[in-house]
Amino acid sequence: MTNQIPPSLAENQSKLKQSFVGLQMLFVAFGALVLVPLITGLDSNTALLTAGVGTLLFQFCTGKQVPIFLASSFAFIAPIQYGVQTWGIATTMGGLAFTGLVYFALSTLVKLRGAEALQRFFPPVVVGPVIIIIGMGLAPIAVDMSLGKNSAYAYNDAVLVSMVTLLTTLSVAVFAKGLMKLIPIMFGITAGYILCLFLGLINFQPVIDAPWFSLPKLTTPEFNLEAILYMLPIAIAPAVEHVGGIMAISSVTGKDFLKKPGLHRTLLGDGIATAAASLVGGPPNTTYAEVTGAVMLTRNFNPNIMTWAAVWAIAISFCGKVGAFLSTIPTIVMGGIMMLVFGSIAVVGMSTLIRGKVDVTEARNLCIISVVMTFGIGNMFVDVGNVSLKGISLCAIVAIILNLVLPKAKNEVE
């Protein structure tokens, strides 16, 4: 964490230049940021607002020491979709607001017992398969949208647009250099959108009718015990992944943010940002690896850059035409992007197992991973009174319990 890192280019920059670099950072995050609300049916302008406010809250909790940007989390896409269908948006937001308690609990655990305590309760054998289930559970949604199911798009148009979008995103991710490599989603959406224009699939009337200035669509949360219990365990995977995000930005800047301001404070900041976003109708927040990559490339280590990125996000959220334009992006374009993004989530879970050197031939690990994968892919559910546990939440609970109950192999016992 204390490698010799070249000095930040932002240290002596003027406020004006810092503001433009902040806008650049927001642009890097923009594609992924708005993708979550577009997929889940939430308001894009609200997502921009809560990303900006969430980043500022994170900076407040961490003493403005960490150059990191928080925005919409992909881990909550399936839970939000299920929640909206089951309880409606207001109750779903109420359940998501309570996920901040998971971050608070982990923050307290780290404060009292140290970061090593997370390894005991949430080792790679627990977190890895849960993340895989998050990605695999979303795969059917991506395919259905790519094929134009439940939409007015013809099959041939849907496949053409989604595949062009996917191939463009793949090409940029693999072959592009520099900052371009960090925004493959933006390039994919642009290519798919232009093709849709040629095919006559875009209706610009909502953009024409929308005002330049309008308030983001805020939602007052409602609270339901079943929704809360369903959402709480889902926060475990992104909360543990938060540690990886902080380690990454520490490596990039040459500063150990796990010690100063401390992992307990970064977890608390992420949790408060997530709860605050949900309380007004925005998707939960998480740290963005794309922005960390941009920080590495540009060597802009000054946290003020992220303050400006947050301010830009808040300012743009009040432009009605931005939200209206984003709403014109066809679902078949989103489907093409999602096939890569959701698969990537599953790969992150696999890499968690690999980096953690999890021996899948060892009976204990094999049992944990197998049960979690079967429960997740097979849509297992458990009814307890009026509460039903299913999907990612059930998988997370089962993984934690099995990890605590099943005896470790002799060579794993400390």
Curated annotation (Swiss-Prot):
Subcellular location: Cell inner membrane
Organism: Haemophilus influenzae (strain ATCC 51907 / DSM 11121 / KW20 / Rd)
Signal peptide: none
Cytoplasmic face residues: 1-14, 63-65, 113-124, 172-178, 249-261, 299-301, 355-365, 402-414
Transmembrane segments: 15-38, 43-62, 66-82, 92-112, 125-146, 156-171, 179-199, 225-248, 262-281, 282-298, 302-319, 333-354
Family listed: Belongs to the nucleobase:cation symporter-2 (NCS2) (TC 2.A.40) family.
Reported function: Transport of uracil in the cell.
GO MF annotation list: uracil:monoatomic cation symporter activity
Main location: membrane
Topological category with respect to the lipid bilayer: Multi-pass membrane protein
GO cellular component annotations of the record: plasma membrane
Name of the gene: uraA
Binding residues annotated for uracil, in chain numbering: F74, E241, E290
Name of one Pfam family that matches: Xan_ur_permease
Coiled-coil segments: none
Intramembrane residue segments, as ranges: 366-401
GO biological process: uracil import across plasma membrane
Periplasmic side: 39-42, 83-91, 147-155, 200-224, 320-332
Keywords assigned: Cell inner membrane, Cell membrane, Membrane, Symport, Transmembrane, Transmembrane helix, Transport
Catalyzed reactions: uracil(in) + H(+)(in) = uracil(out) + H(+)(out)
Protein name: Probable uracil permease
